A protein has these predicted regions:
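Short, solvent-exposed loop/turn positions at domain surfaces
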Residues: 6-7, 80, 113, 203-209, ...
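Proline-centered turn/helix-capping motifs that create local helix->coil transitions or kinks
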Residues: 141, 173-178, 273-278
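Amphipathic alpha-helical segments with low aromatic content
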Residues: 90-95, 99-161, 310-349
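Hydrophobic aliphatic residues
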Residues: 23, 65, 140, 168-172, ...
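Non-catalytic DNA-recognition/assembly elements of restriction-modification systems
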Residues: 152-177
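A short glycine-rich beta-alpha junction/loop motif
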Residues: 26, 41-48, 79-103, 243-249, ...
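DNA target-recognition patches
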Residues: 1-6, 169, 173-206, 245
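A short beta-sheet element
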Residues: 8-68, 211-274, 287, 295
Length: 349
């Protein structure tokens, strides 16, 4: 609203005005305003957007502006490399090709509007599944100084057991002898162990990979780098490939599956409950160049508290079911987005 807007937002927008993103337009964060102004309330737009008011059907033009072909015409007129941008005057020189038939415009826009709503619904489903999984993870695991988690699985009442990390896992220090493996991995907090090339679009590893640790599918790695939301680093299991190599800055390990279930442990490390064990042995102030000052010995001396193997497997099965639903929802959401892009290519020139 106008009274709440910053000084750079000075232009009053009206119902059905289209706001086109002028900075980094390839992101397609465009918007069609659907709220009428009143005598007591006016809406304004940032100067980072071009304000478009059309005599054609607004929804139809909005979808046309989101096509890849229109975006290509915009990008060739942009200036700047890191933050490519187009001004309103240059944007106005782009020719639009569209059907003048208002009935056809209406049918096309209604179809694409319905698809947009379905995509938004699917995104909400995905987000809700992520929230559900995160909430369960925080309830069914507990830190080493807590007797039991907030929630126990029905039918399981036996006390949890506290273990040193060295009791249920062993360090991996196998080097990539003879450069057997060339796939360099990195830990991305949200995506797990992934190819460095695909994540950074380049390799930042040494040319000589013989000194790197060799990790196999199902084994774990701890990244001592901390970042916003990950104050104690991240632990991830290698799931997406058979093997890869990691910098010696990582602590790599495999688990004893007679004590801890692999899937259970994977979800445990998605929780915050293991942070307590690490904070008990780490020097809070010892953070060097973005790395926690945690020695290998200290790391394997951290304490963790787990239920019986039977309860672990039930917890893992429950969380795996939610994860599968989440994956299916993500795939379906991607199908809807691809369907929309296909329709945009077919319905607009």
């Amino acid at each position: 609203m106008r009274e709440e807007a910053p000084s750079r937002a000075q232009r009053v927008i009206d119902n059905n005005d289209i706001l086109f993103q002028c900075v980094r337009p390839y992101q397609k964060n465009n918007y069609i305003h659907r709220i009428l102004n009143t005598s007591n309330q006016q809406w304004v737009a940032s100067t980072g957007y071009a304000q478009i008011r059309t005599t054609e059907l607004p929804n139809y033009i909005y979808h046309l502006l989101n096509t890849d072909e229109f975006n290509r015409k915009v990008m060739v007129r942009c200036t700047g490399s890191s933050y490519p941008a187009i001004n309103s005057e240059d944007l106005a020189t782009i020719h639009l090709y569209y059907t003048p038939d208002k009935k056809e415009q209406l049918k096309i826009s209604r179809l694409l509007d319905l698809l947009d709503k379905r995509i938004a619904t699917q995104n909400k489903i995905i987000e809700d599944l992520k929230k559900l999984k995160s909430a369960i993870i925080e309830k069914v695991f507990c830190p080493p100084n807590q007797k039991q988690p907030v929630c126990r699985i029905k039918g399981f009442e036996q006390p949890l057991t506290t273990y040193k990390m060295s009791a249920f896992c062993s360090r991996i220090a196998t080097k990539n002898k003879d450069a057997k493996c060339s796939l360099v991995l990195t830990i991305a907090a949200q995506y797990g162990l992934v190819s460095q090339d695909s994540f950074f679009n380049k390799s930042v590893a040494s040319e000589n990979l013989t000194g790197y640790y060799l990790l196999h599918k199902g084994e774990f790695a701890y990244n001592r780098s901390y970042s916003a939301g990950y104050d104690w680093g991240t632990v991830k299991r290698l799931d997406n490939c058979d093997e890869g190599v990691l910098s010696t800055l990582y602590i790599c390990f495999k688990i004893n599956e007679t004590i801890v279930d692999s899937d259970f442990l994977t979800y445990y490390f998605e929780s915050t409950k293991w942070h307590k064990g690490l904070s008990d042995i780490a020097d809070e102030g010892a953070r060097n160049h973005g790395l926690l000052n945690v020695s290998i010995t200290d790391y394997f001396n951290t304490k963790h508290r787990f239920p019986s193997m039977a309860e672990q497997k039930v917890i893992a099965k429950m969380l795996n079911a939610i994860t599968e639903r989440e994956k299916e929802a993500i795939v379906l959401g991607e199908c809807y987005r691809k369907q929309k892009q296909f329709l945009l290519r077919q319905m607009f020139i």
